[in-house]
């Protein structure tokens, strides 16, 4: 694990990807992917349609010293793919806990991207958490498999509001404890 000099956010490498802090130059690809309803509807926070300026605002928030989460670009250029194929994040919670989130562009689905990058972030544990939570929509069992394959345990059902769907959506909540 290497530290990025600007943000002090670690760079995490996997066999195929480099998980690195976002750059302003990532805006075009992030916007292209998040405009896709299939991506937005599997998240709680991405609106659909994506309003003008939303991506730049998101990147500015991610680069802020006062940010509440660390967000990594999934850089696949070393594998001969796109420079950004998705994002993975850890949002800081109280009591040395965080919440894992990720999305992958549809062109790269079913290729193990989410599993590989989630496992790498969990192994690196860059925030030195005791516990990491994750929540997935119940209509996305592939994301649930990613979590169970990374050692997460199911803890219960809940609901979360999806901005893109403009509705509450049934979720499964998972936990991974380190201590």
Regions found by a protein language model. Name each.
Residues 38-60:
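Conserved GNAT-fold acetyl-CoA-binding loop/helix
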